[in-house]
Amino acid sequence: MIIAITEIMDLIPHRYPFLLVDRVLKIDPNKSITGIKNVTVNEPQFTGHFPTRPVMPGVLMVESMAQLAAILVAKSLDSTKNKEVFLMSIENTKFRRIVQPGDTMHIHSVIDQQRANVWKFSSKVMVECEIAAESKFTAMIKDKM
């Protein structure tokens, strides 16, 4: 099932310039999700990271993995209209390849464990069939205030 940007914006609260998932290519609710982020030179982080050689910041790659996992949570629960997903911890993060404008990040997240409102994920970012980043993280689902 492909999920376009308009539905993504219905599922998570992030907006430009911090919306870091462009499209979901495949989703298996309660299991895994794959999406993409097209990296373009006109994104604001590249004015300072780095002006003469733009490089996608690692923290934004981690954020893209977390956003994709939040979409998976939204599609796995019966209703997320009154729920929010919050990042609790990040573990074993590794950056293995530079990501730069013109690259397409293929992001994949898998649910490792779910207990009540705490979910654990393994995620990775691939560019041209190479691992660019990988991480494990934990998120908490809370009622909206």
Swiss-Prot record:
Molecular function, one GO term: (3R)-hydroxyacyl-[acyl-carrier-protein] dehydratase activity
Subcellular location: Cytoplasm
Domain of life: Bacteria
Keyword list, A-Z: Cytoplasm, Lipid A biosynthesis, Lipid biosynthesis, Lipid metabolism, Lyase
Reactions catalysed, as given in the entry: a (3R)-hydroxyacyl-[ACP] = a (2E)-enoyl-[ACP] + H2O
InterPro entries (alphabetical): FabA_FabZ (IPR013114), FabZ (IPR010084), HotDog_dom_sf (IPR029069)
EC number in record: 4.2.1.59
Location of the active site: H49
UniProt GO BP: fatty acid biosynthetic process; lipid A biosynthetic process
Keyword GTP-binding: no
Root EC class: lyase
Keyword field contains Membrane: no
Any GO CC annotation of this UniProt entry: membrane
Function as written in the Swiss-Prot or TrEMBL entry: Involved in unsaturated fatty acids biosynthesis. Catalyzes the dehydration of short chain beta-hydroxyacyl-ACPs and long chain saturated and unsaturated beta-hydroxyacyl-ACPs.
Sequence similarity: Belongs to the thioester dehydratase family. FabZ subfamily.
HAMAP family xrefs: FabZ
Name this protein carries in UniProt: 3-hydroxyacyl-[acyl-carrier-protein] dehydratase FabZ
